């Protein structure tokens, strides 16, 4: 009977540092990429989330997720003097949840359909949670939110459009497609470098359930 895929503390630390450094540097690079506008639609590179997604699908998902969130916080926010508190905490939590769930959903990294669905699913979860938090922040900040004419509709429309834009543009081009290409290519080749066995359906972590959530 094969054992579940487990990692030692040193291996988890290596995955954490690898995810933090690679994704942190990638977020610095995205700050330099200009956005362009077509009519009322603005296209911009939100993030290169494929980096932690690939690591989460091949290694320990929690280590990769926490590393990515920490890397973005340190490299993109604190080092650039953009740390604002609540917004960064929100991004830290949503990125961790999205990447972790995506990594747990993949049992066989060779299954391209599951890899693609998990990658875009992780992006959707992260973006949806961020959208909900942004809407709630406006509701709590504005007294009598429903009483202001047109405010609820404009907030929902703006946040909803931003959600779709980020998922369809950055989510597909810079998250799902690179992940779909890299995970099968790296599977079985990068794990031995950290002294780990490749993930299989028999050794993968158990599916997400109530016990895991608790």
Per-region residue spans from a language model:
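Short alpha-helical interface elements
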Residues: 46, 54, 65, 78-80, ...
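Interfacial aromatic-anchored transmembrane helix boundaries in multi-pass membrane proteins
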Residues: 27-42, 71-104
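Short helix-perturbing small/polar motifs within transmembrane alpha-helices
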Residues: 2-27, 90-138, 180, 184, ...
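Hydrophobic alpha-helical membrane segments of integral membrane proteins
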Residues: 63-71, 86-90, 113-117
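Membrane-embedded alpha-helical hairpins and interfacial helices in multi-pass inner-membrane proteins
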Residues: 35-37, 41-42, 109-214
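Short hydrophobic/aromatic-rich motifs at helix boundaries and adjacent loops
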Residues: 21-28, 70, 154-159
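Hydrophobic transmembrane alpha-helices
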Residues: 1-64
């Amino acid at each position: 009977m094969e054992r579940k895929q487990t990692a030692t503390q040193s291996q988890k630390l290596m995955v954490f540092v690898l995810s933090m450094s690679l994704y942190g540097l990638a977020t610095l690079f995205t700050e330099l990429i200009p956005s362009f506008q077509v009519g009322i639609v603005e296209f911009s590179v939100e993030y290169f989330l494929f980096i932690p997604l690939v690591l989460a699908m091949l290694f320990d998902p929690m280590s990769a997720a926490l590393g990515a969130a920490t890397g973005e916080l340190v490299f993109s926010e604190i080092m650039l003097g953009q740390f604002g508190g609540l917004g960064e905490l929100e991004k830290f939590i949503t990125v961790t949840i999205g990447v972790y769930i995506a990594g747990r959903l993949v049992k066989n990294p060779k299954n391209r359909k599951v890899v693609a669905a998990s990658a875009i699913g992780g992006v959707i979860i992260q973006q949806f949670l961020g959208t909900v938090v942004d809407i709630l922040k406006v509701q709590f900040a504005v007294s009598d939110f429903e009483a202001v004419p047109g405010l609820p509709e404009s907030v929902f429309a703006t946040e909803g459009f931003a959600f779709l834009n980020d998922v369809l543009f950055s989510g597909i081009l810079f998250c799902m497609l690179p992940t779909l290409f890299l995970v099968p290519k790296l599977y079985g080749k990068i794990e031995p470098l950290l002294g780990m066995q490749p993930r299989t359906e028999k050794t993968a972590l158990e599916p997400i359930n109530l016990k895991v959530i608790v």
